[in-house]
């Protein structure tokens, strides 16, 4: 008896189609034969085969075509402008970014962002308030949404409270905006401690919410970025989730690290006299004397254990000893992580001079340009710098994102966490 056949029409992104045809040629088979193979294997309940099919190949839904031009972007929990400056700089063949609105709760931070990031986009709105008091339903729409939801309760520095802390649940306000607006993409950033908060439950809950957000869901590429591997002069590790709307049929690939590390000494070279935020941190005579016994790359505990540190300069600390206390930089390596808070001994110390770094030097390690002026007191500026995403690191990721939207190839590596097709992930 002859087999009854029927035709299935599929509409897919042109770049995905090209890649699929190239794969078929490599396997020395036809497109029709390969599609039949996928379908037959799927019917046999081998559901892993479905993950091999590019997003939307099996949905039959038309794929929206993106028009060249400026993508309107919004930032929640913007910080002083690490990502904002990267948005201003990033261009591609077809796309650029245009700020629509941003929000942060800290007044100095908002003033810094307004002065530096929005100086050429006066129509963009800066909302300076607690996000819990913001009317999400009245915020302007945007093509892209970026947010570094507060990391205080997910950080590895200090006690990690995760979703049970005061700030752990604030990611949900971003999800609320995505649900309402359905932007083309989102960029979500948090500290490396996110994966272990609440025994991993925090990350799973956030991933579930973002993967299933909006009308179409978002195909998410989740990766732990070690920015020092991308030429940033600082060991700074951040989870970044790039989500592309499910109906677009595209998946973000993690850009390949440069493999070139930039030393902190190179980064701090030739700071111009006119650059703002260069006021020296006042060091007591006791602190200067203590630093004189600490060698390049060492912390106070190592100096103490070596027997070099006199008794009157030792710290009477019980319990856990943080490795960054009075730790000098190693001039031949990237700096250790620049933080935004902490008491005595946590200010990042010069490799040879008996002093802490200036805020401008700390900003250099975060790759802020020298003409970027932070607003506020010395401690306020320190906090702003320490909470930011490195400008150059964000730009590398945003450039890859635009290439993804354009369908252009670039060198990439497998994500450390994984790729989650739209509306497929559920918290266990």
Annotate each PLM feature.
Residues 27-52:
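Short, basic amphipathic alpha-helical segments that act as recognition/interaction helices
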Residues 48-65:
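RNA-binding accessory domains that recognize and position tRNA/RNA substrates
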């Amino acid at each position: 008896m002859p087999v009854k056949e029927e035709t299935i029409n599929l509409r897919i992104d042109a770049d995905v189609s090209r890649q699929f045809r190239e794969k078929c040629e490599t396997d020395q088979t036809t497109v029709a034969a390969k599609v039949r193979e996928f379908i037959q294997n799927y019917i046999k309940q081998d559901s892993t085969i479905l993950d091999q099919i590019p997003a939307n190949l099996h949905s039959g839904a038309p794929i929206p075509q993106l028009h060249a031009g400026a993508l309107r972007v919004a930032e929640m929990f913007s910080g002083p402008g690490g990502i904002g400056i990267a948005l201003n700089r990033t261009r591609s063949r077809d796309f650029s970014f245009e700020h629509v609105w941003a929000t942060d709760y800290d007044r100095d931070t908002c003033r810094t962002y307004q002065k530096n990031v929005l100086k050429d986009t006066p129509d963009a709105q800066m909302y300076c308030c607690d996000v819990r008091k913001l009317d999400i339903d009245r915020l302007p729409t945007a093509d892209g949404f970026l947010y570094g939801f507060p990391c205080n309760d997910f950080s590895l520095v200090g006690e990690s409270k995760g979703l049970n802390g005061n700030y752990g649940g604030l990611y949900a306000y971003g999800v609320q905006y995505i649900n309402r607006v359905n932007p083309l993409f989102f960029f979500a950033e948090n500290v490396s401690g996110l994966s272990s908060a609440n025994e991993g439950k925090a990350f799973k809950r956030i991933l579930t919410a973002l993967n299933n957000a909006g009308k179409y869901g978002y195909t998410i590429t989740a990766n732990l970025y070690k920015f020092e591997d991308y030429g940033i002069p600082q060991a700074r590790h951040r989870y970044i989730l790039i989500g592309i709307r499910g109906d677009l049929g595209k998946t973000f690939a993690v850009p390949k690290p440069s493999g070139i590390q930039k030393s902190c000494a190179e980064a701090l070279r030739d700071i111009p006299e006119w650059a703002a935020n260069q006021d020296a941190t006042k060091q007591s005579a006791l602190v200067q004397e203590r630093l004189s016994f600490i060698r390049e790359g060492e912390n106070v505990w190592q100096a103490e254990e070596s027997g070099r540190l006199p008794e009157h300069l030792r710290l009477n600390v019980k319990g856990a000893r943080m490795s960054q206390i009075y730790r000098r930089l190693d001039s031949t390596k990237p700096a250790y992580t620049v933080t935004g808070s902490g008491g005595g001994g946590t200010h990042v110390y010069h490799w040879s001079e008996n002093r802490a770094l200036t805020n401008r030097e700390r900003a250099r390690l975060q790759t802020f340009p020298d003409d970027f002026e932070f607003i506020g007191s010395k401690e306020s500026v320190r906090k702003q710098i320490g909470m930011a995403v490195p400008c150059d690191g964000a730009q590398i990721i945003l450039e890859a994102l635009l290439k993804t939207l354009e369908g252009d190839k670039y060198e990439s590596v497998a994500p450390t966490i994984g790729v989650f097709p739209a509306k497929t992930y559920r918290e266990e």
